[in-house]
Structure formats: structure tokens, C-alpha cells
């Protein structure tokens, strides 16, 4: 077991920072004694800090934990704590922590952790040191000590301020026990499993929904694929037919084109001849007209001479035209100059009008300015300006503006200063008010404190009266107690003579020596085994499980104590006596009892068949019925009824949507309803089947319309070609019959009428297709609603109503059965108490046996696993065999030690119990004898408290007067503050209004002054404009004369040009006549050449039937158009299907479906496994917690009953209760039990009972949780305890030491100021020395070891 040996302290709290203090810890008891404030608790704080890293409470983040720099007179104080201890295997370890406290310049102190290290020794004896971060060392030391950190914090090294934590608030108590049981990490594990299960459940639902969607998509995808394959096959055949037709048409068109080219050339020549003849006639007519129109015929001149004459006349005319152009340009320049001058005159006239307007406005502006200035002079009594006559001169105005501006600035600054002064006054009054309120609060607080002191003193007086009464009543019991002392002493001497403690101790020493030798041999074998075996951790687990089996067997033996045996004798006298008569050996005796209990259990169960079994069965039935009833209630209220309501609301919403759609599309719904006249059960008269049929009909109708649209488009193109061909060839393109004029006109008119009607038909078809698509889309959207509505009406709602009806019937039956079972349980519960104790023992033994069997099966599994993975089986088997032999020997010795220990323990307990009773009686006698002195002391204390109360009452009255005075002064100051504030606000408002008026007037005067101009300057500008106008009018007159002269020259030139033009025209007409004559002769020659070519082509043209060829081509084209239309529809369908298949929804849809299916199945498997894990872990935790709490409460009961001397509490227990929440949290509370009555101890016990209960609980926790660490430190355990309980507590500690002293490493550390308590503890002779803590001359804590005999 772990044990601590030495502690070095330097610079902690009041310990000297320059010199280290060392304390040795003894086994099994270490006593530390000192006055209050000497530094005793610092030792516990250092132990706790070294082992856990936890600072003491209220130490300012470590600054108060180190010796203060101001007291030491240094800027830095360094501190160190060293602890030497041995781990559970006896290996020495030294833990060291170094700290410092630095004084900063800003009067603040800085705390630092300098170093944290561990020192240990190797097998060769060499020292090994390792440094850690503080957080790592906080985890390392508890592991080395073999105990959890919460046990070190709250149990072993519990601080004095936290020692009463078992009776703290429920939340704090739960936090402590959760840390001790390590509940947080297991709770987190459970919560993590639960959260993960919820996530998986949600994921499974999502995966199922996705699978349903994907399955529907797969069906749709397969259907589209089939349609696509079929359409592609038809489309491929159609394309092949089109290629063949196209090749045939091209060949026939080549032949026809050759013929057409020849015909067209012949026709072109004929046309050209016709045109030339027409041109010839026209030119002859023009030639004759020209000849008739000639005024003069030039017959003697040649053509060249006529052209020369024409050119000369042209040159003269051009010269005259140039002169005319120049004159016209000069005229335009003169006109533009006149326009410019007119614009300048207009502009000067407008500027002249503006100046005249300004001159007329100056008087009104001056008058307005002077009026406003006069008002300001009168308002503010400006003496310098009162006597000045109007209008004001410019210098007067400037001076006035300057002065009035200065007055405005003075007014603004005055307002600001006034506001600042008044705010200072208000702030001063507010500060006085605040001070009065602070004084009143201080007086009130002081009065409340004194009142609480009076109340506390009154309670103390009542307590003193009770103690005086108790001591007065106990004086008459002296003779009775003396007789009891004599009788107890005689019984004690008899018990000591009967017990052979020395012989038993000698046997135990010999067996312990032998056990140690065997343990060393086992350790040697185990070390050899570890070298050979790679599964060290598995071997360790095997050893732990074997120890668990031994511990469980010991627990079974401890359960079969004398009390249980007596109980079995009472229940089964014959069976038990037959087994017990001839057995001397204790182990064999208990083994026989255990063997006999197994066949006895059915016998007991038969006897309890009427009581316990029937009661348990009834309780189970009752619980099942109650759970069923609760489930039915919950299912009705939380599941069925909300679902039914939800479904009905959903149905109403669907009905509303359908009704709205019926109103909007009444004609369509009438068609649907007409097909459903015989169906009266379905609401709205619409079924899913009829609705789907209607949608299919609409799809067929839409397909027919689209086909009609494509056919009409083809007809439009084809008929236009027929019209064109008919006009060209005068025959029908289909039948190739020639048509005369009327037939052709009628034929073309019929085709054109049909073609003209096609756009209207196409437009009408587009509208019908669009309407059909819209209606189809609306019906498709409405189809899911119809489906859901029908499912609700026919399935969901009837099923829910049927479930509701069945649940209501079950609820009625369950209520009747629950009442019946409850009455039966109440009648049988009182009859099962007699068998409860023995049954609980049997249950415990049965559970322990099951646990042993479970552990043995786990051991077998571990051994099989190790043997499978082992590489050297033979060597391991040999070592295992030797190890088993040694372990068997060790078990035999341990059984013998256990037998001797139990016998020694029973004898010691009997002797100790008699000694305790004797000491208790002596203490009562001493207490009663000293009662008279105590009564006088209590009465003096009572008088002193009464006088203190009177004094405090007078002080409270004086404080109340001060409070009233402060409140009155505060009210007066508040009234003054409000009056000043109102007056200030009124004056500020008046000043602000005056300032605004002043600012508006000043701005107005400045604006008017800026508009005033010099009149002389305006008149000067007006004269200049008038002079400019006169000059411009003179220039305008000159330009007008020049313009008239130019116009006269232009008229003369134009007359000359007109006379020359007559001669020129005669020459031109003669030239034109001669040209036309030559052209007519040239055309006659062309006509003769063309006629010769026509004769040649008509002779060489082959006679080929072109009409039949055209009919064949038209037939092929018609077939080609028909197939083209079909392929276009197929191509559209193929593209649509391919687009549909290329959507992300259908891409890799088979793989997605497969992956989703696998994921769903694996997720469901994982969810089931998580449920199993959660239930197994939860069950294991609750079972462990229940067993551990039973062990703790048994230990508490044993210690309490041997310690507490009062008769008001039989025992105390820790109750652990599961909360009703879903998280299954466990709440704890400490209860005190008297008879069958159980009360919460918190708030109902005295201070002494509180301290004793907390100590007992800590002792019990240490006993049950510290299997590898036998250390326990108690700091001032006797505070608030009376003398009788102090002595009894000391005896209990001695009993614990006595029972544990054989355990290697058990240490009890007690810190106290009560030397009498130390004397009680010294009676056990478990320590020769004690440590005394004192303060030296420098007020540093000093440790000194002294002999216990000196006390």
C-alpha cells in the first residue's frame, strides 16, 4: 500500500522562506498538535497541493499560499514543497514543486510555478529525476499512489474549510460524489452512445425515404430507357429511307435540270428577241419624236462639229454660272452679318431693361434694410445709432453690423457660462444627496448587523438554558454510574483472561513471514513470466480478476456472521442444527453452511410463497399494469390523439386545396366527376384512379395536337411549292395535268386559300397545346394531394380512430386491474418483513457467486486468448504451473491468517467494546460531578449575553435616529435640486429664443446689404449700352444697301444664261436624234443574230418527257417530307428522353441505390449494437454503484454506532436516488435514522452532529475506495464535539487503527489543538512521538518532535 514518509515545507504560508521545515510521518498514527494560527492546516494544504495540484480555498490564485513578500522584506519569495512516499509496490518516490511570488512595481503580486519534478530509484539504486508540466504531474502522482484524484481531494487530504462537504447543498454533494465515482466520464459515454443512436435513427429514416424515392426513379428510368431504344431504332430506319429517297431525287433532278437548262436558254433567247423588238419600236418612236421637236436642223455640220459647238456653249454658261454663284455667296454673308447685328441689338435692349429694373429696386431694398436696423437699435438700445437719420450711410451700416455681431457673440458666451455655472451647482447638490444616501445605507447595515447579533445571542441564551437544565437533571445519577463501573471492570478482566492474544499474534507473525516469502517467490515467477509473455496487460487483468474472486469469497464469509446464523436457526432450526453439531473447523463449517444454503433456498422460497414471492409477483404485475396504463395514457395523449388531429387538419387542408382547384377549373373537374357518378363513398367525388385516367387522356390529347401541328407546318411548305410550280409550268405538280387560265387560277386560288388559313390553324393549335400543357401540369401537381387525401380517408384516419377506441377500452381495464393489484399488495406487504434479512443475504451470496462465475469465465477467455497469441507455450506453461502451486500455498496461508485475524479481531472487539463502555461511564460520571461548575459558568455567560443585547439595542436606537436625519436631509436637498433645475431650464429656454431671433435678424440685414449696388455705376452702364445700339443700327443700314446692289447683278446674269440656253438645247437635240438613229440600226442587227440562234437550238433539242420526270420527283419529295416529319418527332422524343436520363437524378442511379441499401443495412446493425452497448454499460454502472453504496453505508453504520453517544440518532446513511429525467442522473443526500423514521440530516442536525457525520462518512469512503492507499488526514476533527463524543470518537479511531495496523502502509494523520483528545489517542500506544507546531520570534511556523509521554 502507498505510504508517505517525509514532507519538506519552505516559504509556504507562515513557514520560513529561508529555512526548510521537515516532518516525518509514522505508521499507523501521526499526531500534529498546535495552537490556532500556528500553521497546522498548512501541512494538510501542502500534502494536498503536492499530490493533486489543488490550491487551498480563498488563496487569491496562489498569491496567499506563499509567504508574503512584504513580511519577508524581499521583492521575490521562493517556496518549495517536497514529499517522499512509497507507491503500492514499495518503491520510494519524491515529488517536488517549486513556486515563487514576485512583488511588482504597481503594488501587485505575481504568482509563478517554477518547477515540478518526480524522483525515483531504479532497480540498481540509481536516482532518476523527471520534470513535468504541472498539469501532467497532477495526473501522474494519483496514478503512482494508486488512488483517484477526487479521493485525494475530498477524502484523504480534505481541507478544514471543506471538511463538511457531505452535508453541503445537493448540487455540491452530487458534484463531489460524481467525481469520486468518476460518473462524469461514464455519463458522457452514455450520452455519447444515446446521441449517436439518435443520429443513426434520423439517418435511417432519411435513408429509407431516399430509397423509396430512388426506387420510384429507377422504375421511371427503366421505362424511359425502353422508350428511347424503341425510338432510336425507328429513327435509324427512317434516316436510312431518307438517304435513299434523297439520292433518287438528286439523280432525277440532275436529269431534269439538264433539260430545264436547255429550255431556259431557248426561252431566254426568245425573250431577248421579243425585248429587242419592243426596244426597236420604242427607239424608233423616240427618234421620230426628236426629229419632230427639232427647232433647227443642222444637216451640213458633222457630228464632231456639233459636239464642239456644244462644248463652247457649255464653257460660256459655266463662266456665267460661276459669277452668279459668287454673288449669291456674298449676299448670304451680308444676310448673316445683318442677323448678328440684330441679335446684338436685342441683347443690349434686354440688358438695358435689367439695369433699369435694378435702379428702380434699390430704394425698396434700402428702406427694408434701414427698417430692420432701426428695430434692432430700438430693441437693444444702441445709443450710437439712435440719433442718426435715415437712410443710413455705408460706413454706418458696416459699423452697425460689426457691433451687432459682437453683441450676438456676447449673448452666446453668456448663455454657455450660465449653463455651465448652473450645472456645477446641480452636481454639487447631487453629490450631497448621494453622500446622505451612503450614510443612511451604512447606518442601516450597521443596525442590521447589530440586530442579527442580538438574535444570535438570544439563540445562545436559549441553548444555555437548555444545557443548565440538562446538567441540573443529571446530578442524581452518580450512584448508578459508580455501580456500573465496578460491574464493567469485573467483566473486562474476565474477557482479557479468556483471550490468548499473544499466542494468536505469534502465529500471525509466523504466517506473515511465510506469506512474504511466498509473495516474493510469486513476484519472481511473475517477472519471469512477463519477460516471456508479450501480453503483460492481459496477465495483469487475470491477476486482478483472481483477486476479485478471493475478495468475493471473503465477502460471502463475512456475510455469514453469527447474526445471520441465528436468523437461519430461527427460520430453519432442524436443517441448520443438523449441519452445525459436529463441525469444529471454521472454514469447513462455513463451507458446509454455504453448501446447505443452496438446497435450503427452495425450502425458504416455498415457505415465502404465500408472502414474499406472491408479493413480488404482485408488485411486478402491478408495475407491469402501471407501466401499461402509463403507456396507454401516454400513447393516447402524446401519440394517437395528436396524430389523429394532425391527420384531420391535413385532410382539411387537402380538401381545401381540391375545392379551390375545383372552383378555378370547374369544367375539368366536371369531366372527372362525370366518370365517377356511381362512387358515393369518396369525398369530393374524385378518386386517384379516375384522376390518373383523366391525366392519361390529357396526355394523349396533347400528343394528337402536337402531331397535327407538325403536319400543318409541313402542308404550308408543300402547298407553297405547288403554287410556285403551277404558276411556272401551268400544270398540277401531283397529277401533271395541264391547266388553262381559269383552271390554273381556280387551282392556285384554292391552294392559296388553304395556305392563308394554315397560320390561323397553327396559332389556334399552339393555344390549344399551351392550354393542354398548363392543365396537365395543374393536374400533375394536384395528383399527389388526391393520393394523400385518399390515403388519409381510407387508411390513416380510420386506423387511428380504431387504435384510439382500443386504447380507451384497454385504459378502462387497466385502471380496474391496477386498483385490484394495489389492494392485494397492501394486504401482503406487512407479512414479508420476517424473511427480508435472510433473503437479502442469500441474494447477495447468489449475486457474488454469479460474479465469481462470470469472472472465472472471463479468466478462462483471457487465458485462451493469451495461449493463442503466445509464441513459447511450453515455457509459459511451466512458469504458470509453478506460479499456480505458489498461489495455492499463498491462499492456504491467507486463509489461516484470515482465521487468526478474525478470531483476534473478535476478541479485541469484545475487549475494546467493554473498555469503551467503561470509559463512557467514567466520562459521564466525571461530567456529572463537574456539572455544578459548568452550571455557574453557563449562567455567567448568559448574563454577559443579556447585557450585550441591551447595549446593542441602545446602539440600534441611536443608529435609527441617524438614519432618519440622513433621510430628511436627503429629501431637502432633492427638493432644492428640483427647484434649481426647473429655474435653470426656464432661463435657458428664454435665452435660446432670444438668440434665435437675434441670429435671424442679423442674417436678414447681411442678405439685404449684399443686394445694394452703386446707382452712378448702374447709370454709366446704361449709357454705354445706348451708344453701342446706335453704332450697330448705322452698320445695319450700310449692309442693307450692299445687299440690294448684289441682287441686281444676279438678275442680269440669269437673263443672259436663259438666252444662251435656247441655242444650246437645239444643238443638243440634233446630237440626240443622230444617236437614236444609230441605236435603232444596231438593235436590228442584234435581232437578226438571235433569230438565227433560235432556229439552230430548236433543231438540236431532244424530245424528253420532262413532265413525267417532275411527277416522280414530286412524289419522292412528298414521301421525303412525310418521313422527315416523323423523324423530327422521333428526334424530339429521343432528345427529351436523353435529357431526362442525363439529369443528376438518374445518373448512376443503380449504383446509388445499391450503396444506399448497403448503408441502410449497416446503419441499422450499428444502431442495434449501440442499443446493446448502452443498456449493458448502464446496467453495469448502476449495479456497481448500488453495491458500492451498500458497502459505504455498512461502514458508516459500524463507525457511527461505535462512536456516537447520543440516543436521538441510531445511524446515518447516504441515500442515492435516480432523478426522473431522461438523463438518469443520481442525486445524493445524507439521512439520519431513528427507528423506522428517516429524515434529511442537512439543516436538522447540530454542529457537533454535523462534524461527526462528515468525519464518519470520510472514514467510510476511505475504507471502501482506498484499497491501495491507507492514508487518511483529519484536520481538527473534534471541533463542535462535546467531551463524551470526543472521547468516543477517539476510541473509534483506535478501533480503526487496531483493525488496520496489520495492513502494511496504513497511516492516520490527525491535526488538532485539543491535547486531551491527543491523550485519549495515546492510550492505544500506537505512536511514541507527536509533532508540535509553534510560532518562533519571527512569527514563522516551527515543527518540533516530542515524546507522547510528555503530554
UniProtKB/Swiss-Prot annotation:
Residues 688-784 form the Zinc-hook domain. One of its GO terms (molecular function) is G-quadruplex DNA binding. ATP binds at residues 13, 36-37, 39-42, 66, 68, 160. GO terms for cellular component: condensed nuclear chromosome; Mre11 complex. The keyword Coiled coil applies. Its EC number is 3.6.-.-. It is found in: Nucleus; Chromosome. Mg(2+) binds at residues 41, 160. It holds the Pfam family AAA_23. It comes from the Eukaryota. It catalyses: ATP + H2O = ADP + phosphate + H(+). Binds 1 zinc ion per homodimer. Zn(2+) binds at residues 732, 735. PROSITE patterns: ZN_HOOK. Component of the MRN complex composed of two heterodimers RAD50 and MRE11 associated with a single NBS1. Belongs to the SMC family. RAD50 subfamily. Component of the MRN complex, which plays a central role in double-strand break (DSB) repair, DNA recombination, maintenance of telomere integrity and meiosis. The MRN complex is involved in the repair of DNA double-strand breaks (DSBs) via homologous recombination (HR), an error-free mechanism which primarily occurs during S and G2 phases. The complex (1) mediates the end resection of damaged DNA, which generates proper single-stranded DNA, a key initial steps in HR, and is (2) required for the recruitment of other repair factors and efficient activation of ATM and ATR upon DNA damage. The zinc-hook, which separates the large intramolecular coiled coil regions, contains 2 Cys residues that coordinate one molecule of zinc with the help of the 2 Cys residues of the zinc-hook of another RAD50 molecule, thereby forming a V-shaped homodimer. The two heads of the homodimer, which constitute the ATP-binding domain, interact with the MRE11 homodimer. This is DNA repair protein RAD50. It comes from Dictyostelium discoideum.
Amino acid at each position: 500500500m502507498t505510504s508517505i514518509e517525509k514532507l519538506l515545507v519552505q516559504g509556504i504560508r507562515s513557514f520560513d522562506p529561508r529555512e526548510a521545515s521537515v516532518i516525518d510521518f509514522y505508521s499507523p498514527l501521526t499526531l500534529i498538535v498546535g495552537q490556532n494560527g500556528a500553521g497546522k492546516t498548512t501541512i494538510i494544504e501542502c500534502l494536498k497541493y503536492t499530490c493533486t495540484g489543488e490550491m487551498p480555498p480563498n488563496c487569491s490564485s496562489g498569491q496567499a499560499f506563499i509567504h508574503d513578500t512584504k513580511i519577508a522584506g524581499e521583492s521575490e519569495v521562493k517556496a518549495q514543497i517536497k514529499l517522499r512516499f512509497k507507491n503500492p509496490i514499495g518503491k520510494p518516490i519524491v515529488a517536488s514543486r517549486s513556486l515563487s511570488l514576485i512583488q511588482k512595481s504597481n503594488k501587485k503580486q505575481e504568482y509563478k510555478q517554477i518547477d515540478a519534478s518526480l524522483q525515483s530509484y531504479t532497480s540498481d539504486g540509481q536516482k532518476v529525476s523527471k520534470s513535468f508540466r504541472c498539469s501532467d504531474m497532477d495526473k501522474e502522482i494519483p496514478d503512482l499512489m494508486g488512488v483517484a484524484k477526487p479521493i485525494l481531494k475530498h477524502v484523504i487530504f480534505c481541507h478544514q474549510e471543506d471538511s463538511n462537504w457531505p452535508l453541503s447543498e445537493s448540487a455540491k454533494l452530487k458534484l463531489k460524489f460524481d467525481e469520486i465515482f468518476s460518473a462524469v466520464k461514464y455519463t458522457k459515454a452514455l450520452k455519447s452512445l444515446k446521441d449517436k443512436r439518435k443520429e443513426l435513427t434520423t439517418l435511417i429514416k432519411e435513408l429509407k425515404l431516399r430509397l423509396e424515392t430512388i426506387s420510384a426513379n429507377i422504375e421511371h428510368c427503366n421505362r424511359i430507357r425502353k422508350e428511347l431504344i424503341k425510338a432510336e431504332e425507328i429513327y435509324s430506319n427512317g434516316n436510312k429511307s431518307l438517304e435513299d429517297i434523297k439520292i433518287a431525287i438528286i439523280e432525277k433532278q440532275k436529269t431534269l435540270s439538264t433539260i430545264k437548262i436547255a429550255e431556259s436558254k431557248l426561252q431566254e433567247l426568245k425573250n431577248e428577241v421579243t425585248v429587242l423588238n419592243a426596244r426597236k419600236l420604242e427607239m424608233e418612236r423616240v427618234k421620230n419624236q426628236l426629229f419632230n421637236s427639232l427647232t433647227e436642223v443642222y444637216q451640213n455640220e458633222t457630228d464632231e462639229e456639233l459636239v464642239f459647238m456644244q462644248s463652247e456653249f457649255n464653257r460660256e454658261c459655266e463662266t456665267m454660272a460661276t459669277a452668279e454663284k459668287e454673288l449669291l455667296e456674298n449676299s448670304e454673308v451680308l444676310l448673316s452679318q445683318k442677323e448678328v447685328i440684330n441679335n446684338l441689338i436685342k441683347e443690349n435692349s434686354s440688358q438695358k431693361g435689367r439695369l433699369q429694373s435694378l435702379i428702380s429696386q434699390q430704394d425698396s431694398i434700402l428702406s427694408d434694410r434701414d427698417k430692420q436696423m432701426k428695430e434692432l437699435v430700438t430693441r437693444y438700445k444702441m445709443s450710437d445709432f439712435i440719433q442718426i437719420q435715415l437712410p443710413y450711410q455705408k460706413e454706418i451700416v458696416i459699423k452697425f453690423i460689426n457691433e451687432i455681431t459682437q453683441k450676438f457673440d456676447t449673448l452666446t458666451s453668456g448663455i454657455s457660462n450660465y449653463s455651465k455655472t448652473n450645472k456645477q451647482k446641480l452636481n454639487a447638490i447631487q453629490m450631497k444627496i448621494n453622500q446622505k444616501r451612503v450614510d443612511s445605507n451604512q447606518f442601516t447595515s450597521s443596525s442590521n448587523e447589530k440586530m442579527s447579533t442580538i438574535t444570535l445571542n438570544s439563540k445562545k441564551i436559549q441553548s444555555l438554558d437548555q444545557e443548565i437544565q440538562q446538567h441540573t437533571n443529571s446530578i442524581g445519577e452518580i450512584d448508578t454510574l459508580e455501580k456500573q463501573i465496578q460491574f464493567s471492570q469485573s467483566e473486562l478482566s474476565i474477557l482479557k483472561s479468556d483471550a490468548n492474544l499473544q499466542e494468536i499474534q505469534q502465529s500471525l507473525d509466523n504466517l506473515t513471514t511465510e506469506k512474504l516469502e511466498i509473495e516474493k517467490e510469486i513476484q519472481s515467477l511473475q517477472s519471469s513470466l512477463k519477460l516471456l509473455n508479450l501480453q503483460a496487460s492481459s496477465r495483469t487483468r487475470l491477476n486482478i480478476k483472481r483477486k476479485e474472486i478471493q475478495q468475493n469469497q471473503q465477502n460471502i464469509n463475512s456475510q455469514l456472521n453469527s447474526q445471520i446464523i441465528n436468523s437461519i436457526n430461527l427460520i430453519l432450526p432442524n436443517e441448520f442444527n443438523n449441519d452445525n453439531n459436529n463441525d469444529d473447523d471454521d472454514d469447513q463449517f462455513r463451507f458446509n453452511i454455504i453448501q446447505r444454503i443452496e438446497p435450503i433456498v427452495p425450502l425458504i422460497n416455498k415457505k415465502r410463497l404465500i408472502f414474499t414471492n406472491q408479493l413480488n409477483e404482485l408488485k411486478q404485475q402491478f408495475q407491469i399494469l402501471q407501466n401499461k396504463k402509463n403507456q396507454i395514457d401516454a400513447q393516447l395523449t402524446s401519440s394517437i390523439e395528436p396524430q389523429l388531429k394532425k391527420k384531420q387538419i391535413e385532410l382539411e387542408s387537402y380538401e381545401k386545396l381540391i375545392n379551390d382547384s375545383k372552383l378555378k377549373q370547374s369544367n375539368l373537374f366536371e369531366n372527372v366527376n362525370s366518370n365517377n357518378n356511381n362512387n358515393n363513398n369518396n369525398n369530393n367525388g374524385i378518386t386517384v384512379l379516375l384522376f390518373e385516367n383523366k391525366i392519361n387522356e390529357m396526355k394523349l390529347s396533347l400528343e394528337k395536337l402536337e402531331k397535327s401541328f407538325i403536319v400543318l407546318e409541313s402542308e404550308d411548305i408543300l402547298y407553297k411549292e405547288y403554287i410556285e410550280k403551277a404558276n411556272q409550268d401551268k400544270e398540277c405538280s401531283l397529277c401533271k395535268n395541264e391547266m388553262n387560265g381559269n383552271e390554273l387560277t381556280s387551282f392556285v386560288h384554292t391552294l392559296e386559300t388553304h395556305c392563308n388559313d394554315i397560320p390561323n390553324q397553327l396559332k389556334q393549335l399552339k393555344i390549344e397545346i399551351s392550354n393542354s400543357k398548363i392543365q396537365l401540369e395543374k393536374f400533375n401537381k394536384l395528383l399527389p394531394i388526391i393520393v394523400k387525401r385518399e390515403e388519409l380517408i381510407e387508411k390513416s384516419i380510420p386506423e387511428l380512430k380504431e387504435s384510439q377506441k382500443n386504447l380507451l377500452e384497454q385504459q378502462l381495464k387497466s385502471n380496474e386491474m391496477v386498483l385490484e393489484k394495489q389492494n392485494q399488495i397492501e394486504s401482503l406487504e406487512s407479512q414479508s418483513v420476517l424473511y427480508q434479512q435472510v433473503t437479502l443475504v442469500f441474494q447477495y451470496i447468489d449475486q457474488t457467486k454469479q460474479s465469481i462465475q462470470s469472472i472465472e469465465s472471463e479468466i478462462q477467455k483471457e487465458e485462451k486468448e493469451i495461449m493463442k497469441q503466445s509464441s513459447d507455450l511450453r515455457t509459459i506453461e511451466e512458469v504458470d504451473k509453478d506460479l499456480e502451486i505458489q498461489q495455492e500455498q499463498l491462499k492456504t496461508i491467507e486463509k489461516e491468517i484470515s482465521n487468526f485475524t478474525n478470531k483476534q479481531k473478535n476478541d479485541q472487539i469484545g475487549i475494546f467494546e467493554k473498555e469503551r463502555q467503561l470509559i463512557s461511564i467514567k466520562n459521564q460520571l466525571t461530567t456529572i460531578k463537574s456539572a455544578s461548575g459548568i452550571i455557574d459558568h453557563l449562567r455567567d455567560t448568559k448574563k454577559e449575553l443579556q447585557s450585550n443585547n441591551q447595549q446593542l439595542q441602545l446602539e440600534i436606537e441611536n443608529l435609527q435616529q441617524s438614519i432618519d436625519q440622513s433621510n430628511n436631509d436627503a429629501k431637502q436637498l432633492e427638493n432644492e435640486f428640483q427647484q434649481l433645475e426647473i429655474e435653470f431650464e426656464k432661463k435657458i429656454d428664454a435665452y435660446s429664443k432670444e438668440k434665435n431671433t437675434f441670429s435671424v435678424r442679423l442674417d436678414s440685414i447681411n442678405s439685404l446689404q449684399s443686394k445694394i449696388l452703386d446707382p452712378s455705376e448702374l447709370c454709366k452702364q446704361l449709357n454705354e449700352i445706348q451708344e453701342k445700339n446706335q453704332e450697330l443700327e448705322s452698320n445695319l443700314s450700310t449692309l442693307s444697301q450692299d445687299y440690294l446692289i448684289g441682287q441686281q447683278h444676279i438678275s442680269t446674269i440669269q437673263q443672259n444664261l436663259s438666252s444662251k440656253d435656247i441655242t444650246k438645247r437645239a444643238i443638243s437635240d440634233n446630237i440626240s436624234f443622230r444617236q437614236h438613229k444609230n441605236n435603232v440600226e444596231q438593235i436590228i442587227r442584234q435581232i437578226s443574230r438571235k433569230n438565227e440562234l433560235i432556229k439552230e437550238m430548236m433543231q438540236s433539242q431532244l424530245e424528253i418527257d420532262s413532265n413525267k420526270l417532275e411527277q416522280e420527283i414530286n412524289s419522292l419529295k412528298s414521301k421525303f417530307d412525310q418521313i422527315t416529319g416523323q423523324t423530327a418527332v422521333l428526334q424530339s422524343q429521343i432528345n427529351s428522353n436523353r435529357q431526362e436520363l442525363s439529369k443528376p437524378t438518374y445518373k448512376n442511379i443503380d449504383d446509388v441505390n445499391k450503396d444506399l441499401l448497403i448503408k441502410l443495412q449497416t446503419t441499422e446493425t450499428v444502431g442495434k449494437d449501440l442499443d446493446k452497448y448502452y443498456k449493458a454499460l448502464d446496467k453495469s454502472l448502476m449495479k456497481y454503484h448500488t453495491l458500492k453504496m451498500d458497502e459505504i453505508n455498512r461502514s458508516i453504520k459500524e463507525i457511527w454506532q461505535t462512536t456516537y453517544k447520543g440516543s436521538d440518532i441510531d445511524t446515518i446513511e447516504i441515500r442515492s436516488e435516480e432523478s426522473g429525467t431522461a438523463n438518469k442522473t443520481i442525486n445524493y443526500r445524507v439521512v439520519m435514522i431513528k427507528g423506522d423514521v428517516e429524515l434529511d440530516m442537512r439543516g436538522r442536525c447540530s454542529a457537533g452532529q454535523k462534524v461527526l457525520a462528515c468525519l464518519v462518512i470520510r472514514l467510510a469512503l476511505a475504507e471502501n475506495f482506498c484499497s491501495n492507499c491507507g492514508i487518511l488526514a483529519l484536520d481538527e476533527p473534534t471541533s463542535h464535539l462535546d467531551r463524551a463524543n470526543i472521547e468516543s470518537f477517539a476510541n473509534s479511531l483506535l478501533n480503526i487503527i487496531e483493525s488496520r495496523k496489520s495492513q502494511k502502509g496504513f497511516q492516520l494523520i490527525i491535526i488538532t489543538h485539543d491535547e486531551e483528545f491527543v491523550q485519549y489517542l495515546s492510550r492505544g500506544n500506537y505512536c511514541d512521538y507527536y509533532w508540535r507546531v509553534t510560532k518562533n520570534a519571527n512569527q514563522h511556523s516551527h515543527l518540533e518532535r516530542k515524546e507522547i509521554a510528555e503530554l
